[in-house]
Structures are given as C-alpha cells and as structure tokens.
Amino acid sequence: MFIDRLIENIKSKKSPVVVGLDPRIEMTPQFIKDIAFKKRGENIEGVCEALYLFNKGIIDAVYDIVPAVKIQVAFYEAYGIEGFKAFFKTAEYAKSLGLMVIADVKRGDIQEVAKMYSKAYLQNQLFDAITVNPYMGEDTIMPYVEDAIKYDKGIFALVKTSNKGSKDIQDIKTTKGEYVYQSVARMINRISNSAIGKYGYSSIGAVVGATYPEEAKVLRKEMPNCFFLVPGYGAQGGTVEDIMDCFDENGFGAIINSSRSVIYAYQTPYWKDVYSEYEYAQAARAEVILMTGMINNGLVKRKYIAC
Ligand SMILES: O=c1ccn([C@@H]2O[C@H](COP(=O)(O)O)[C@@H](O)[C@H]2O)c(=O)[nH]1
C-alpha cells in the first residue's frame, strides 16, 4: 500500500523530510541558465530546461537521504506545455532514483471533473500521491479516494493549511461548536478507514501546516488514521518545535515538506558563506541533513522514537 511504502521509505532513509521542488527562474543559478539557454534558446523552452536541470541537481544531491519529493505544479503550469514537460520529466527522474513523488496539485471539483483530474495524476505511474482540496464536500473527493485504493496511491487532503488566511474560513465555528477544519478533519479521518495499512495509518492523509502547532496537536488526536503532510517549515516560519505534535511516539505520523529553505539553501544567511551558487545542490543536501538531525533530536528529546 502507498502508506506502507512511504513509512518504509521514511524508515530506510531515517528521515521524514520531503523536498519541495518549486523552482523559480529568477532564483536559478546563472551557470544553469547559461547551459539551458545555450541548448534551447533564451525563451520558454530554455527557461523550462533550466528549471529541469536545477531540479535534477537537487534530486541527485538528496535522493539517498529523503523518502520523497513534492512537486508543486504551479511552478511548471505557469510555462504552459513546456512547463508541463519539465514537471513530468522531474517526476520521472525522481522516480528513476527511487524517490516517491507527491504531485501538489490541490485538485477538487465536482465528481465528473474530479474523475478526470484523478485519471491525470493517480492513474499516472509517475505519481505516488497527490494533494486534494476537500472544501467542496465529500462527493468531490471520492473519485480520488476510489482511485487511490484501486491504483495503490495516496492522497493528502487539505485540512488546516499553513497560510495566514487559512483562519478566514477554516477557523469559522460551526453550529456543532467546532471549527470548520475540525469538521473536515472528521470527514477525512472517517473516509480514511477504507485504506488502512499494516502500520495503522491510511493512504488517505491530511495536509496540516507547520505554522499552526496548537491546531496540529488537536488534529493529531482527532485524525489517528491520517498521516500528515506538513508544509510551512522554514521559509514560512515553522520550526522543529512547531512540528513535533504532528508525530506519534513511534516517530511516524508526519512528513515535513520544505521547499525554498532547501532548494535555495545556498542563498540563506546560514549557508551563503559556505556554498557558492555552483554548489547549490550540496547546500540543499547540507540543509536536509541539518533539518533531519534537528527533527530526530526533537523526537528523541520527547522520548519518541527517531525516524
Ligand atoms: O497549506 C499548505 C499547503 C501546501 N503548501 C505548499 O507547500 C510548499 C511550501 O513551500 P515553502 O517554500 O517551503 O514555503 C508550496 O509548494 C505550497 O504550495 C503550503 O505552503 N501550505
């Protein structure tokens, strides 16, 4: 099952860190752009080649120390068909090195449309899991759940997102006296019963932001079946302490995504005097090792088992 494979990958890499491949052309090292533009021209094709080459460097540097990568489709979709090619090529390369691939596509929509989104991603062998948006209601996520079970894939449903504005709707109190995100959490946890693996977690998981540690603590209890995909670590302000309550005492229960803080580590105050732009991938590796060490130390301090 997807979730068992994910847990086994976390165990074998001894890391719950997911690297987010969200490349920006304006932050891409010049030497990569030079290579890409020379090969494909200083145009959309060249830009997309540069994004792919950048990702390839990161993947080469981290594939042996993380269980998965998360690829945010917006950074590719912005460039049309060439962007999509870079998106698929990135997924293909990550898979070829044994990484699990989460497509961050946050899909939703009415059932008939959701079926087509699901066909695009969950029926595609390149992707192990996708993110979905359940805020249109249960019927809209069932096509993804059905395909996840049928094709042995995973889904992570948005429950409490990491952005500031997540409170605008997700934190409204319902007539039952709970927050909207808790109602969504209850729905997802119930649905997730249909896909529980041998470690007690389901292939139907939840997105819970690192920037809301109190809410995450509540949700960990209210969603015992659901593995959390936790964005918001690093660049958005989430810290190791903030994510601790996403884990269970066996050191499972969560994968922690970091995109900018890892892929652009060489530009951060911590690493910028150590690594040049030519060494951006080594900097990303160093940041993942540091992040993994800090998370595992945090787990040990709590007397939880480290990953
Ligand atoms: O609640 C959410 C859900 C998804 N994301 C995604 O995670 C990364 C975060 O990038 P950073 O550079 O580490 O901030 C990005 O792909 C978002 O789409 C999120 O941030 N919050």
From Swiss-Prot:
Keyword terms: Decarboxylase, Lyase, Pyrimidine biosynthesis
Pfam families found in the cross-reference section: OMPdecase
GO biological process: 'de novo' pyrimidine nucleobase biosynthetic process; 'de novo' UMP biosynthetic process
Active site per database record: 106 (proton donor)
Gene Ontology MF: a single term: orotidine-5'-phosphate decarboxylase activity
Pathway the protein contributes to: Pyrimidine metabolism; UMP biosynthesis via de novo pathway; UMP from orotate: step 2/2
Keyword Lyase: yes
Source taxon at top rank: Bacteria
Entries under SUPFAM superfamilies matching the protein: Ribulose-phoshate binding barrel
Catalytic activity: orotidine 5'-phosphate + H(+) = UMP + CO2
EC number of the protein: 4.1.1.23
Gene3D superfamilies: Aldolase class I (3.20.20.70)
Matches recorded under PANTHER family: OROTIDINE 5'-PHOSPHATE DECARBOXYLASE
Homology family: Belongs to the OMP decarboxylase family. Type 2 subfamily.
Official protein name in the record: Orotidine 5'-phosphate decarboxylase
Organism per entry: Thermoanaerobacter pseudethanolicus (strain ATCC 33223 / 39E) (Clostridium thermohydrosulfuricum)
